[in-house]
Amino acid sequence: MASLKKSRRVRLILFSGVALVSATALIGYAMRDGIQFFRTPTEVATDPPAANEVLRIGGMVEHGSLVRDGANFSFRVTDGETSFPISYVGIVPDLFREGEGTIATGSVIGGVFRATEILAKHDEVYMPSELAEMEALRD
């Protein structure tokens, strides 16, 4: 009787272990493309995404490429090797400018990255203008 309970317990533990390993492998496989925070322009150019695949592209806003027409923005993002055209409609962050880092979320349509969101990258010493003004008044 005791050996029967022990063998059932061992089988249950083995089955649970196999199920846990399988679930972890399936989750890892499903997330393989989403683990990377953003792709560089070179990666997007050499390995084009599927039609309407939402992804992030990151790099520096190329000097001389930023064109603004009301709320419409078009610019090129570069990683120093390849540049990729981006278009965006909306309000851009205060720190968004040529020569600065940016990450855009969207999809590639007709060879142009159509962004739905723009993030500006900044260093660790960034201080919002409101706080900088308060700091200046305090001094």
Swiss-Prot record:
GO terms for biological process: cytochrome complex assembly. This is Cytochrome c-type biogenesis protein CcmE 2. Residues 1-9 are cytoplasmic. The chain crosses the membrane at residues 10-30. It is a single-pass type II membrane protein. GO terms for cellular component: plasma membrane. It is found in: Cell inner membrane. Its main location: membrane. Keywords: Cell inner membrane, Cell membrane, Cytochrome c-type biogenesis, Heme, Iron, Membrane, Metal-binding, Plasmid, Signal-anchor, Transmembrane, Transmembrane helix. GO terms for molecular function: heme binding; metal ion binding. Pfam families: CcmE (PF03100). InterPro entries: CcmE (IPR004329), CcmE-like_sf (IPR036127), NA-bd_OB-fold (IPR012340). It comes from Ruegeria pomeroyi (strain ATCC 700808 / DSM 15171 / DSS-3). SUPFAM superfamilies: Heme chaperone CcmE.
